[in-house]
Amino acid sequence: MSTDITALQHQALVYDSLDEYVVRAAAFLREGLEHGDGAVVAHTRAGIAVMREALGADADAVRFVDVGEAYTRPAHTLAAYHDVYADQLHRTPSLRAVADVQFGPDPGEWDLWTAYEAVFNESFAHLPARVLCTYDGSRLPERILDAVWRTHPTVLTEDGARTSDCYEEPDQVLRRIATPSAPLPQLRSIGFGRDAEEFRERLAREMNLAGTPAGRSLDMLLAATEVAANAVTHGGGIRDVRAGSAGGRFACEIVDAGPGFDDPLAGYLAPRAGSGSGLWIARQLTWSLEFFHGPRGFTAQILL
């Protein structure tokens, strides 16, 4: 019989040593396996090797995910876990997952991964899953460790599971960490053109001038087309398009002639029946997608 998991239980563990991680993660997974839960482990290749050895014969029942491949950009990571969890839940009624969280060395990217952890609560709320996010407390800075308590309803301590009194709802986290957005001055206006085909031609020309690799150019073309379609279908049409290189990334800004919207979760949640998938796709294909009210109107800023 599977454990009584009917909705997401998003927990965190801050460990001080690899030995502590292995002991607690293995016990967490084995308890689930004994009750018929599916099992997932996400870690570095070295971490996966250690967990395989620790689990012994039980490792055959576990799905292993290389975080080096999964943790590329936040929305892509959400989509990757959606696929992994869905596959497991086709086989078992509920699952347990251990994911070693990788924030990366660049402090400028930490807020993006904090947003990912916050959105995780909403994105997977409906799944019968107990997910344990693990953090190496011996090397992570205080800023990230503080975010652990703000993005996980429950944190496992030496004294057992503790409800976080610092926990914030996903939209609260995203609003709190959001930096004031503004049009990028490096970009130039290229306009939308007569139709979507001309829009893509203009954008492709700018990316060619910027030396953007062909594969990534296609990602931007697909993402920008989805964002533009959203502005036409749900907004007030397109007032302007600006594009160019900024801060080492290619950027595209699409200015909506309508009033815009106020939803920090837009594009982070997987589409369900009756909802569109355009912004979800755009977030997966690009590094970031931000919306703000700029001098010329409501603006979608896409960074590749």
Give the positions of each predicted feature:
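Conserved beta-strand-loop-beta-strand hairpin that lines the nucleotide-binding pocket
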Residues: 232-304
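Hydrophobic pocket-lining residues that define ligand/cofactor binding sites across diverse proteins
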Residues: 32, 207, 231
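Non-catalytic sensory/regulatory segments that transmit input signals in bacterial signaling proteins
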Residues: 1-196
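Conserved short strand/loop->alpha-helix "switch" segment adjacent to the catalytic nucleotide/phosphoryl-transfer site
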Residues: 197-226
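Coiled-coil dimerization/phosphotransfer module
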Residues: 183-186, 218-235, 264-269
